[in-house]
Swiss-Prot record:
GO biological process, one term: cytidine deamination
Location of the CMP/dCMP-type deaminase domain: 57-172, 196-303
Record protein name field: Cytidine deaminase
Active site: E113 (proton donor)
Positions of substrate binding: N98, Q99, E100
Family the UniProt entry places it in: Belongs to the cytidine and deoxycytidylate deaminase family.
Assembly behavior: Homodimer.
Amino acid sequence: MTHHSLKHISDRIKQALNQIENRNLAQDLWYILGEQNFQGFLPAFTVNHFCEKYHMTDKELALILLPVSACYANPTISHFSVGAIAKGESGNFYFGANQEFCTTNIQQTVHAEQSAISHAWMRRESKITEITVNYTPCGHCRQFMNELNSAETLRIHLPHSQDNLLHHYLPDAFGPHNLQIDNRLFDKKAHNLFLITEDPLIQAALDAANQSHAPYSKTYSGIALQLQDQQIFQGSYAENAAFNPSLPPLQTALNYLLLNGNEVENIARAVLVEQPFRLSYRGMTEELLAYLGDIPLDYIQVS
C-alpha cells in the first residue's frame, strides 16, 4: 500500500510549519512534536504554555495548527486534505485528518472530524468541548458529532467563523434522544464482555470492545493492532443514531495508529473481538486489512 509514505510525517510537518508566520512558535512546535515522535497530540500544559508565551487564545492556536493537523491526512481518493483539532474537557488538543483507502469501498473512509474525535476517545478523553476544522463540516460529520455527550454545548471553529454551536449547523436534529438512548459517545460503558487470555493483543481488543458505543445494534466490537516493534493500538466501534455515520473499529484503530506518527505498513497482527448481535464487522475488517497488505485477522466471538 502506498499511503502517503513518499514523505515521512516529519517532512510534511516541517513543510507546514514553514508556513507559520511566527518563526519562534514554528520552532517550538517542531521541537515539541519531534520530542514526542510526531504524535498528533498536545497536552493541556503545552497548549497553555504556547498560549501564555505567544499571547494567544487556545482557539487561535488551534486555527494555526490546522495545516499541521492536515499533514496526517491520507487523501488517496480525493487528494483533498482536511485537518481538525478536537479540544477535550481536559484541555488537551487531539489532531485529526481524513483517511481514505483506494480500491476498497468509499464507506471505509474516515472524515477529519471523526478522526480527531475518535483519536481523543482512544486516548480516554471524557468529553469534547470544541472542534476546529479548516473546512465547514459535512452533513456526515455533523451527524457523527451529534452522538457526543457534549453535542448540545459543542462549539465549532472555522477559519472564517468561530464559536458556533453544533446545532447551528444541524438544526432540528435527529439523534440518540429520538431512539430513547441516554448513553452517548464518550460516556463510560459497562458491557462486561469476558475472555480468559494471557495474550496482550487479545486483551487489548477485548478492552476496546468493552469500550465500544453500540446502543442501537448491541454489537460490541473492538480491535487491536500490533506493530512489528510490539506497539499496540486499539480501536472501538462508534455507532451512530443515523447508522451510516458510524465508525467501524478498524478505522478507529488505523486512525489512532496514523495520528501517532506510525505507518500501516508496520502492522504485524490484528485481533477483532466482537459480540455480533445484529451486525458483524468481520467481513469489512478483513477486506480493508487485505488492502493494507494481506494482514491476517484473528476473529474472536464473545457472548
